[in-house]
Amino acid sequence: MTKIGVFIPIGSRGWLISTTSPATMPSFELNKAVVQQAEHYGLDFALSMIKLRGYNGPSEYWVHNLESFTLMAGLAAVTKKIQLFASVAMLTMPPAVVARMAATIDSIAPGRFGINMVTGWQPKEYQQMGLELTPEHFARRYDYASEYVQVMRDLWTKGVSNFKGEFFQMDDCKLSPRPSAHIPVVGAGQSERGMRFVAEYGDYNFIGAGGDMNQTDGARTMVAKVEAAAKQSGRDTGAFLLLMVIADRTDELAFAKWELYKQGTDIEALEWQASQAGQDTVAKEGSTAAALVRQIKNPQPTGMLKLIGSYEKVAAMLDEIALSTPGLKGIMLTFDDFVIGMEQFGQYIQPLMRSRNPNLKRNLDAA
């Protein structure tokens, strides 16, 4: 069965850079409602990003943000089954501290916690705190991340680290209590080097498939690259596709919402995004930074794959992606309106999905 998760709304406006999209204001209560809905409907995981500064522009996109680890610790205490991933901006916290934070959340939710590794791409986000995303950082960020994960894994598995690397030197560094189970590490490596990092040190790689609408075959190339990198590293790293669902009772109602959001596209925010991402002078064509710069050339509220339509149509498109993309292990959903969208998915979309209902698939195959 294809795994399904949700990328929760930890930042204002969710994932729509628009003044006419739902004015999502992040709070614990909102995210608790979304994650408890997700758990109720049998979703497999919830992931929260880390963003320390938003964009310029009237939409106030990501201007208001919660902190990822503390949010997920709270959510760990009010859920029972769903897997939870927090994100760490690696330049802001030492790996030994993050390893202890993860072990603490594991004691709240044994076996249900993981970490998303973030190297950073928006220079001003770090400059405001006296940190720099220099060209040297951009060139060596995944070397830094590799050492970071090695330190954490030392502490989680052995309770002590004497790791000696270029970026980190541990001196009888201790951690106790250790986690009750393996803590998965995930990333969103889109470049060749990023994919290699996740293949060598991660459990899953979250990928995009561009900003197209209702395209069900766009992830195949990226999934194949993730699989190739994993094979080269001798590991099985799963690819998870990020996409947005905008659904309603009919195609017409769903597309009307998208047209409304497009009317409010925040050009100033997109220009800010491009100017910040463009400072990564070592970024290559397949990288996240390159994709963010490219978005200003075709301005729209989101640069991710969008599935727009009736409940039946969205269910069919999700099945097409899940069942006809070789190597794809799962899908991570965002919604235009998270509370309504999660309810729509659980009540009307997921029950129609063969990829989520093995009995339904068997019955249809036998018909």
UniProtKB/Swiss-Prot annotation:
<comment type="similarity">
    <text>Belongs to the NtaA/SnaA/DszA monooxygenase family. RutA subfamily.</text>
</comment>
<keyword id="KW-0560">Oxidoreductase</keyword>
<keyword id="KW-0285">Flavoprotein</keyword>
<keyword id="KW-0521">NADP</keyword>
<comment type="function">
    <text>The FMN-N(5)-oxide reacts spontaneously with NADH to produce FMN. Requires the flavin reductase RutF to regenerate FMN in vivo.</text>
</comment>
<keyword id="KW-0288">FMN</keyword>
<feature type="binding site">
    <location>
        <position position="125"/>
    </location>
    <ligand>
        <name>FMN</name>
    </ligand>
</feature>
<protein>
    <recommendedName>
        <fullName>Pyrimidine monooxygenase RutA</fullName>
        <ecNumber>1.14.99.46</ecNumber>
    </recommendedName>
</protein>
<dbReference type="InterPro" id="IPR019914">
    <property type="entry name" value="Pyrimidine_monooxygenase_RutA"/>
</dbReference>
<dbReference type="GO" id="GO:0046306">
    <property type="term" value="P:alkanesulfonate catabolic process"/>
</dbReference>
<dbReference type="InterPro" id="IPR050172">
    <property type="entry name" value="SsuD_RutA_monooxygenase"/>
</dbReference>
<dbReference type="GO" id="GO:0052614">
    <property type="term" value="F:uracil oxygenase activity"/>
</dbReference>
<dbReference type="GO" id="GO:0019740">
    <property type="term" value="P:nitrogen utilization"/>
</dbReference>
<dbReference type="InterPro" id="IPR011251">
    <property type="entry name" value="Luciferase-like_dom"/>
</dbReference>
<dbReference type="GO" id="GO:0008726">
    <property type="term" value="F:alkanesulfonate monooxygenase activity"/>
</dbReference>
<dbReference type="InterPro" id="IPR036661">
    <property type="entry name" value="Luciferase-like_sf"/>
</dbReference>
<feature type="binding site">
    <location>
        <begin position="50"/>
        <end position="51"/>
    </location>
    <ligand>
        <name>FMN</name>
    </ligand>
</feature>
<feature type="binding site">
    <location>
        <position position="116"/>
    </location>
    <ligand>
        <name>FMN</name>
    </ligand>
</feature>
<dbReference type="GO" id="GO:0006212">
    <property type="term" value="P:uracil catabolic process"/>
</dbReference>
<keyword id="KW-0614">Plasmid</keyword>
<feature type="binding site">
    <location>
        <begin position="141"/>
        <end position="142"/>
    </location>
    <ligand>
        <name>FMN</name>
    </ligand>
</feature>
<dbReference type="Pfam" id="PF00296">
    <property type="entry name" value="Bac_luciferase"/>
</dbReference>
<keyword id="KW-0503">Monooxygenase</keyword>
<feature type="binding site">
    <location>
        <position position="191"/>
    </location>
    <ligand>
        <name>FMN</name>
    </ligand>
</feature>
